[in-house]
Amino acid sequence: MIAIYVRVSTEEQAIKGSSIDSQIEACIKKAGTKDVLKYADEGFSGELLERPALNRLREDASKGLISQVICYDPDRLSRKLMNQLIIDDELRKRNIPLIFVNGEYANSPEGQLFFAMRGAISEFEKAKIKERTSSGRLQKMKKGMIIKDSKLYGYKFVKEKRTLEILEEEAKIIRMIFNYFTDHKSPFFGRVNGIALHLTQMGVKTKKGAKVWHRQVVRQILMNSSYKGEHRQYKYDTEGSYVSKQAGNKSIIKIRPEEEQITVTIPAIVPAEQWDYAQELLGQSKRKHLSISPHNYLLSGLVRCGKCGNTMTGKKRKSHGKDYYVYTCRKNYSGAKDRGCGKEMSENKLNRHVWGEIFKFITNPQKYVSFKEAEQSNHLSDELELIEKEIEKTKKGRKRLLTLISLSDDDDLDIDEIKAQIIELQKKQNQLTEKCNEIQSKMKVLDDTSSSENALKRAIDYFQSIGADNLTLEDKKTIVNFIVKEVTIVDSDTIYIETY
């Protein structure tokens, strides 16, 4: 029930006469209903905290009879700031909002002080609660207790005992991972990605029930000292992360220095020697990776497959003993959302084509203007046509399957399997429709000529400052990134360049 509180002193009665009535009217208007509990102290000074109506309000609030309190402004509650804060604190602890009718009050010096003090008290209480909670947790950690269920694969959290017990079914998988990784005779010796793919193919589910094992999950398991019986707690410093998150900023969680972390002994799943050897192998793998000089691709991060929609990344291939490079949409790593259709294009061929077009733009700007005029109508309309055909195919596929279910009398028909296919087709149709809408939106938007002109001008200025004969691969990449938004490969002869 909504409660309204009004007050007028003897002096104010003499001056204003109907002050109580005007306050009640304003509070009811704010509440938006006449169905309210009224608490009125008539002829009582705001200096006093003990008032009949205010006492009844506080008592009813403690009994849970009140859901919200509306008051004209804080000086109706009390003339003293401390008393205002006492009442406000009582209500907030019972999750009862205190609302003031007078909107101008918040901007007055008194109002600013009230809300500042209210905020300060609230922060102080939070800090004290956090301090007590944190202190209690630390003491429990130091006594060897497990504070939080971290859903650690291979273990079960026993809340009553505050311990971790080995979950043998999952522990077998942990041992398998370590054995595969550390055994020289294993087909996956030192291969994190190979183990992740193997677990996925075996149908082993992760702790969260996922069917796909990401290589990073396997790496984290291999690096986790809990599996040799040393469980780290108090590892992360989350100070300020909640506030940052509420403010819409990225929350930063820091890892505390090892000497500040608290290690609790738990049952080991693998021997300490095997865990140490796994760390050595992981370190060797990292050093090996860093020692390899990566090939520099002109169109890194810009290429997309026009068939499956995957991004195309650079890969090294070998033919007749010689290395060469391609752009491919194939994703071989474990956990990839889409494996891709396998389209590849020679890096040299694609680079020549794209750089050839860019060179024309920066040496003959009029060609860029003509290209921009044709770009949207050609590229987007062709892509839209392909997607609309795919949508039509999925619709027909769903219709055929639905007809099959409704007309068939065959008891051997796997209805569940057919329903699963229908769901997959619906998902595909939804994704295609979303892409279709996105393209249609792009086609409706007029070219931003000022943005295009600026992009071209920056590219031309950069090109002229270096000179055609002095351009390095990095210089070409800079120029390409000024102008090119994305390169889409439909087939070996159809390449679309989307520009800014």
UniProtKB/Swiss-Prot annotation:
Protein family: In the N-terminal section; belongs to the site-specific recombinase resolvase family.
Residue ranges of the annotated DNA-binding region, renumbered to this chain: 152-288
Organism: Bacillus subtilis (strain 168)
Coiled-coil portions: 372-448
Keywords carried by this UniProt record: Coiled coil, DNA integration, DNA recombination, DNA-binding
Resolvase/invertase-type recombinase catalytic domain span: 1-144
Gene giving rise to this polypeptide: cisA
Catalytic residues, chain numbering: S9 (o-(5'-phospho-dna)-serine intermediate)
DNA-binding in keyword set: yes
Transmembrane segments: none
Superkingdom in the source lineage: Bacteria
InterPro entries, A to Z: DNA_bind_recomb_sf, DNA_bind_recombinase_dom, Recombinase_CS, Resolv_N, Resolvase-like_N_sf, SSR_resolvase, Zn_ribbon_recom_dom
Classification via Pfam families: Recombinase, Resolvase, Zn_ribbon_recom
Protein name: Putative DNA recombinase
